[in-house]
Amino acid sequence: MVKTRFAPSPTGYLHIGGARTALFSWAFARKQGGKFVLRIEDTDLERSTQQSVQAILDGMAWLGLDYDEGPYYQMQRLNRYQEVAEQLLTQGLAYQCYASREELDALREQQRLAGLKPRYDGRWRDSRQTPPAGVKPVVRLKTPQHGYVVFDDLVKGKISVANHELDDLVLLRSDGTPTYNFGVVLDDLDMGITHVIRGDDHVNNTPRQINILKALGAAIPQYAHVPMILGADGERLSKRHGAVSVMHYRDQGYLPEALINYLARLGWSHGDEEIFSREQLVEWFDLAAISRSPAKFNPEKLTWLNQHYLKMADDARLVELVMPFLLERNYPLPATENLLKIVNLLKDRASTIEELADASAYFFRTIEPPEELRTQYFTAEIRPVLEYLVDRLAQIEWKRETIHHEIKQTVSSHNLKFPSLAMPLRVMVTGEAQTPAIDAVLELLGKEETLHRLRGRMEIFPG
């Protein structure tokens, strides 16, 4: 059975690159009818935090990336790492190294000055020296000194690395905690991971991890290293490109299905399909379709996708999502029925839930029109026409159809074109020049509030 995993370190939030890796691993497992595992690699005691763990769990939940096992925590498996390290020591496949940090720093400096690649020189590999008193050793793997590590990467193709280019990597630190390479190998082995899907910044780790597996006599999983994500300028993605946490996008009013759709298209494609559901992603997903070239992060494309999903979203769901944004702005919440109508009216004009909240402002408070709009539309000539319309509106049943009829009748009786009246009316009521159809806006605003705003605005007309 296919089994994949996502194994983040809890040293920050779930960022775009990590979320894409999780998505690819999740989609492949679902496509193959396999299992997806979540594992928290928390052995970096100085940087790992419970807050980061929660941020990762929240991000996964929001994206809908459900896992079949986990979350597992490396720090709960320390005995296992120490047990296997002891086994390798007993078999002569690993050794204890007592070299101090100062010694290793001096060695690297000598190698640098000599123009050599910095690497451990194996000074304790076959040493019969008496261990220094009071020094806790690290445990190093006896890396083969001849031959090659060869593996077929499911994205990059065949990769071959000479063993003489690899030094004897540390398996256990002096405090008994595993290094990344040792911990991840044992975790994948014990959890039955068949396919390791991860960023290509881990390619150089793979030969080292394969050598550990060979020392253990274990089966080698299949590897798929996905290309990194770049900013539009070709530089590695960072915060200045908008590469913030997944939850930041939620807080800005993006929908999870939009982010899933966008992340899937970062380095993977299915023909020319730009928009697809989670179910279609699972149906179509193929590791062979992942590009070997880096993907470029385009915030505008993500926003475009989000706009599409907003238009398609259920109004009741959008009401639930927009409410926190309205409360944050101290807007008085109307009845749910009215809020449903407001959302339905405005959602085609918004790119995010946050924009939807901002666009609805004139339904909840009076907005002063900018000077340029007042100068353009509040003229002495149009004032008597508006006064006539206000008198007519005060007498009608408040429905969109009757509102539209009165505006149209007023335009006709005064020999005007529709925009000549609709635009001043729009600016008077909303403070903006661009809104949905003015009759729809007035209906939702309500008769009392509409007349109150129109009569109040008459005072600022010239003449």
Swiss-Prot record:
| Alphabetical UniProt keywords | Aminoacyl-tRNA synthetase, ATP-binding, Cytoplasm, Ligase, Nucleotide-binding, Protein biosynthesis
Q: What is this protein called?
A: Glutamate--tRNA ligase
Q: How does it assemble?
A: Monomer.
User: What does the UniProt record say this protein does?
Assistant: Catalyzes the attachment of glutamate to tRNA(Glu) in a two-step reaction: glutamate is first activated by ATP to form Glu-AMP and then transferred to the acceptor end of tRNA(Glu).
The species is Nitrosomonas europaea (strain ATCC 19718 / CIP 103999 / KCTC 2705 / NBRC 14298)
What gene, per UniProt, encodes this protein? Answer: gltX
What is the top EC class of this enzyme, as a single word?
ligase
* Residues that hold ATP according to the record: 239
Look up the EC number in the record and give it: 6.1.1.17
